Structure formats: structure tokens, C-alpha cells
Amino acid sequence: MLDFFKKSKSKKFKKIQLPNFNKAVDDRFPKNKWNVINQRPDVIIFEGWCVGARAETNKTLKKSINSMEKANDQKLIWRRFVNQQLKTKYKKLYSQLNCMIYLKAKNFSLLQKWRLKQEHKLWLKTKKKGAHKIMSKGDVINFMQTYQRITQNMFKKMPKYASIILNLNSNHQIKTAVYKSK
């Protein structure tokens, strides 16, 4: 993405291929299905579950927050690695953003519910095609535990850093919006 941002800002803009993600197989589509951008964009919307996430203090990493961390990361290897990535590579990436819009759900369990619904819809859409990696309920819960720490940290920190906070209700609708001036 850093390369994409660099190319998109270049005065000597050349066309850019932008990867397209295929959630059904948990990987990118083949290059022939990628988007081609032929002229420099005026606006880029870069979205993702943990876009804008910030590192935690080393002290907060010590306490396990779910069963996955308790069972599989007793020595904090994964937590420290992720935190280091947030302090370095992702901080550099997020510095490219001019405005941060945070879509804030009520809590983590609501996000799990939404993800389960999303997987079910994906299964309905792809069940006849055969090639898919649709997750079971247990798979979704395990998968989401790997992002739980980052997500809960975002619940606390993003309202301080985001330019716009859109508080969502349980039906994905905007309940309230907070606009902050710089």
C-alpha cells in the first residue's frame, strides 16, 4: 500500500494495478481481475478492519485478553511482534492518510455477530461454485481472537485520533456522528 500511495501522488503518474481481494478463498483475485487506475485519483478511500490501529504500551501486552492468547502466546511473542509492526511499518503507512473515519461498533461481540453473518452470506453466494474457504462459527471466533486486542485498543484510542467517528447501531446504521476539527 505504501507503494500505491507513492505512485498515486507522483506528478509522473502511470497507470496502477490495484489488487482485489477474494474473501471466499481468503486471497487476492488473479491479476487479470485487479482494478486498473488510469489517472491520478483525487481521493483514495483506504478501508479495513484495523486501519489506523496504534501500538499499545508494553505493560498492557502482559495480560492475556482471551483464550487464544492464554493458550498460544504465553511468552508474548505474537503480541510483541504485532505491536512492533504497529509502531513501525503500520505507523508509516497510516501517516499517508489525511483523514481518518472510524466506524465504531458498540462492542467486540457485536463485531463477531456481524462477521458470522458475513460468512453466512458469503457461503450462500459461493456454495454452488465450490472453491471457497468459508469459516465455521468456531473458525470465526478463533480468527477474531487474533484481532481482539487491536480492536479493543481501537475502541479506546481511535476516538482521540479519528477526524470523524461514526457510532453504529446493531444494524450497521449510523446512530451518531462526531466531527472533529484539527
Language-model features, listed with the residues they occupy:
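Switch II (G3) loop of P-loop NTPases
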Residues: 44-50
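Glycine-rich phosphate/ribose-binding loops and adjacent secondary-structure elements
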Residues: 29-38
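Loop/turn-to-beta-strand initiation segments
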Residues: 13-14, 40-44, 99
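A short, aliphatic-rich alpha-helical micro-motif
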Residues: 38-39, 94
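Short gly/ser/thr-rich secondary-structure transition/capping motifs
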Residues: 23-30, 80-86
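Conserved NTP phosphate-binding and transfer environment spanning the P-loop NTPase/kinase superfamily
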Residues: 50-182
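Generic detection of short hydrophobic beta-strand segments and adjacent strand-loop junctions
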Residues: 13-18, 37-38, 166
